[in-house]
Amino acid sequence: MINKVLAFLCFTTFIAFSCSNQPKKDVAEPTSMHSFNETYRENNLNRIAFPIGGLGAGMFCLEGTGAFSHVSVRNSPEVFNEPLMFAAISVKGKENGAKVLEGPVPTWKYFGSPNTANGGERTSYGLPRFEKADFNARFPFATINLTDVDIPVAVKITGWSPFIPGDPDNSSLPAGAIEYSFKNSGSSKIEAVFSFHSVNFMKKGEGINAIQPISNGFVLSQKADKKDLSNQGDFAIFTDQPSTVVDNCWFRGGWWDSLTMTWENIEQQKLNPVASIAKDAPGASIYVPLDLAPGEEKTVRLLLSWYVPNSNIRLGEDSKTAIKCDPSSGCCASPYYQPWYSGKFANISEAAKYWSSNYKELKTKSQLFSDAFFRSTLPPEVLEAVSANLSILKSPTVLRQRDGKLWAWEGCSDNSGCCEGSCTHVWNYAQAIPHLFPSLERTLRNTEFTVSQNDEGHQAFRSALPIRPKIHDFYAASDGQLGGIMKVYREWRISGDSQWLKELFPKVKASMDYCINTWDPRHKGILEEPHHNTYDIEFWGPDGMCTSFYLGALLSVSQMGEFLKEDVSTYQTLLKSGKKFMQDSLYNGEYFYQKIQWQGLKAPNPIEMSKNMWNSNYSEEAQVLLKKEGPKYQYGKGCLSDGVLGFWLARMCGLENPMDSSMIKSHLDAVYKYNLKHDLSDHVNPQRPSYALGKEGGLLLCTWPKGGKLSLPFVYSNEVWTGIEYQVASHLILMGEVAKGLDIVRTCRERYDGQIRNPFDEYECGHWYARAMSSYGLLQGLTGVRYDAVDHILYVDSQIGDFETFISTETGFGNVSLEKGKASLNMVYGNLDVKKIIVSGAEQPL
């Protein structure tokens, strides 16, 4: 044995020495134990929480073990809301035959999560459960398999909620479902009972709480009280089984009497119906008897629906000149936010009935989407990244007000939304909604240009909620406002609605003119005056990032104007000048940078400007730095990962490169070379380090490979943001650098393998952060697939040879394939009017 150990040590020492002398690979191999887009097991289940719900309707999460958590149905996130709510099975005549239908409790819940110091009371953690679980996601479906030596039943759990591209209403339902399938894996008949149990977690405030009956289930209910109408809420839980027995009121007592007696009922298979009481029922249960012959399989469908029609959310200061809207128009029936579904359904009964009546059809259509998406032959890390981040659309990050308009946070704090107002400079990155739900995306453009923009063309980059005109008392966001102009072009090309463009274009033109007059008053084609941006600071002097937005906006407004036969000569002249300046004065031969300028401008000096800025302060020490280095929070000679972001957005919007392609590619290659780190152990990050740290890898926002790093560079410069990782990756791929782009994607997703972070919650300034939906751009990056509804042209420009991929348009979704240079289209839902196919620049016969 000793000899074997010595031999092993010698062998490993030799291998370690040999590897240390090997040349470093350009592209890192995946290191995660979880294979991309495959099943999660064991420790990779730890942090999984899969959102189930509707667009702007709230959600709950199905965890990797089968547990319920993150119950957020009150128009706000409640990240640590994990009420006592669980399913169970009891097999008659089997020792240890009663189990919670979940895998083992993740160890991080033992100690460290809220309230664990009190022993994890009022949870199901202490109840027997299945030995093993595995989890697989095929958005919007999640599947869990449970096995246990004591239970001769194979259990499959499927959680889902409607998600049908092009059908925003049925994708916005306050509903979800968990299907429990049981297959007798033994050789004899099994008598079992499925059950589901929940406390009344809707109880809140001083109003009456009760548990009410509903067909084959119960409703957890809280009546409104005079102090707070938003406390009103209902949550229905019911099955599709006519044999369902309902206990509407658990045993009432002290300490843990209710759960103790409920578990006794589960173990002994007591099927005793209990009527509802007037108020204060602690919880309720559903029981469904199951007889299974050997090899027989049965499924119990558990339907969940909720109804919380009011909130106390009102954001943004009203404009003093705003015209009060007519409540009959549906624009602002309440001074506070009300969800879209509150206008469709009058109460929980209507919501639950609609869910039950349309269940089969909605599942079929959602399955069509899932099958079409995962039919793709694209790299698994890409399919995982894109689909996992579609979960953001199920999360409380997204709200949809009563009249159907979309509004969103940037992300979610633990108990509230984070960073309000459909923030334009963050939502610039998000490419999913414009393709999956184009009509909803257009409501964002309508809000930006007709509600949040004043007569001078200034846009408030954070819109009010309920959506209405607000005061214009802060700087416009240069990247957000210029990006919005490009996105109008995108929405026009996706929808083919030229009348919409015609009506909106005067506002677009006013916005463009405001940007020119404010940031380029000398008409140089660059943003010279201090300009606010997504880093929550102002850049002083021209820089590559914001100039790329400027040139993209000038190109898009020129093309839209030409279509409408408008005079766009001024914009074209500025575009030409800006290109020349960026090439000649903002490019160092390898990448684009910033020329810091703070003197000789129209703007007052940085000290005066800082008085109206957010979180900026020129102390005595900072004033010394100002004289030495210039304004705080710049990037100067740095290599910025977002340095050509506007050019990426231009391509995502269907525009050509506004700048010399070789220079753009060179910049992206430099970002990959200098900013991607596969081990951050020695990286200094005094900002927000937990996005990526230690042995993890990530793409840094900025580095200074040629020197010139400032004492106080822009405030997030040392961080890693997934949204930027994906946009750089997809842009690299667009430019032909597939291996480099995929390396970034893998490095990012390895951090989200379920062991430490939730694979379905990429966070930045909050959970389910919107910027991460830049991942959707990977589809276009790899395949070049894009449909232009104005010209009825399907574009294909593959970077990976033959493929099959998903496409979603205004009128339907399906798959596009490329085989031996020939493209084909298969629509599985709706239709697509294609009059021409262009493959890599050449027209292909239909």
Protein language model regions, located:
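Non-catalytic C-terminal accessory modules of carbohydrate-active enzymes
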Residues: G56, S69, N75-N96, V100-F111, ...
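Beta-strand-rich N-terminal accessory domains
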Residues: P23-Y110, S376, V386-N389, L393-P396, ...
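Bacterial Sec-dependent N-terminal signal peptides
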Residues: M1-K25
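Aromatic-rich carbohydrate-recognition surfaces in CAZymes
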Residues: S90-G93, G97-L101, W108-G120, N184, ...
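Acidic/polar, glycine-enriched structural segments that form the non-catalytic walls/loops
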Residues: N21-M33, T39-N44, I48, T143, ...
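Short, well-ordered beta-strand segments enriched in hydrophobic/aromatic residues
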Residues: G176-N184, G821-V828
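C-terminal substrate/ligand-recognition segments
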Residues: A177, V288-A293, V300, C419-V426, ...
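Extended glycan-interaction surfaces of carbohydrate-active proteins
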Residues: P379-S413, S439-H472, T518-P542, Q583-W721, ...
